[in-house]
Each structure stands twice: as structure tokens, then as C-alpha cells.
Amino acid sequence: VGNSQVLTCTRKSNVAMVTWKINPKVGGPCTLGYRADQNKTDRTNCSDSMNWKFRPDRDPALEIRQVGIAHEGNYTCEVVATDGNFHDVYYLTVLVPPRLTLYCDDHGNPVCEAAAGKPAAQVLWVLGSNFTPEEEGHDNGTVTVLSRLTAYGTNLTNTTCIVSHPAGNQSKSIAC
């Protein structure tokens, strides 16, 4: 999320037409088209964040700027050339790194929160095995994972929470 993504498309000489057909999971479909005989591009229902990376007659790659969760979905590039029709199909999955927060609750137990990640993060504790992770799903497809380490009267001088996620791992330590 937040980065730019370029989806490549088959490069051919003698291209007659190139079409990107985009079907996101959220919102309606959009298309980007190019006709060589008129040297004309056209767009239907596409946001400004999606456009040709370069000139479509030279390189038909699609660039998505500031990728968001709404961009997740199917992307198909169709190239019509003198030597045939060519298709490139992608499914764009958007990863959202969670926000890591570590604090002590009212009972002196460390609580680790991996907020609004996509997919849900895995929360683990260094030198701690008695914890209960809870997941809360959000409307935008992200998930918050909350894990409370129960010490049962043991004084945890320094506890480390590790958050494992496809967008990157994080860790924080705290003394409660």
C-alpha cells in the first residue's frame, strides 16, 4: 500500500490495439485502450492513479501510483498484433503493514497490538508462552490482532513482542 506498481504487458511490433481491463474487488471495472491506426488512447472509469507507464505504442505497461486497498483485483492486458492476440493476466494483492503498539494493561501485563494489517499479522512473544491473540476484522479488509501476555505474578523485567507480516517483521520491548 502507498507504493507504485507497474504491470508489464507483452511487447510486440506491429501492434494494432492494446487494452487493459481492470476489475477491482471494490468499485466498478475500468479500461485503458490504445488504437495504433488513430494513435489514440482512451480511458473509461479509471482513476487518475492508473495510467500508461510510457507511451503505449512503445511499451504498454500499466502504472498504478499510490496503490491502495481499492486497487486489489484482476488486471488483464490484451495486445492485438499482426502475429496474433496476446494476453497477460494479473491478480493484484495489496499488503498493508500493521501499526505495532506495545503497552502495559491495568494489571501489569504486556499487551501487543498489530493494528489494521492486511492480511492479519502473527503476534508472538519472546520467552512467553501464555498469551491469547484476538482478531478484529475491519470493513476495509484489514485486521487488528491484540495479544496479551499473562505473567501470573511473575515480574517480567523486559518482554519483547514480535509481529510477523508479509509486508515486514517488527518487534518492540517493554518492562511492565
What residue ranges belong to the model's regions?
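Short coil/turn motif common to extracellular beta-sandwich-like domains
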Residues: 1-6, 103-111, 144, 156
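Conserved Ig-like domain signature around the intradomain disulfide
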Residues: 5-7, 70-79, 108, 121, ...
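Short strand-edge motifs at loop-to-beta-strand transitions and within beta-strands
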Residues: 5-7, 60-62, 143-149
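Ligand-binding face of N-terminal immunoglobulin V-set domains in extracellular IgSF glycoproteins
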Residues: 6, 47-95
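Core motif of extracellular immunoglobulin-like domains
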Residues: 9, 20, 75-78, 92, ...
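N-terminal V-set
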Residues: 12-49, 117-135
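Flexible inter-domain hinge/linker segments at boundaries of tandem extracellular adhesion modules
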Residues: 24-28, 56, 81-106, 127-133, ...
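Short beta-strand segments within Ig-like beta-sandwich modules, predominantly Fibronectin type-III
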Residues: 51-58, 102-104, 136-143
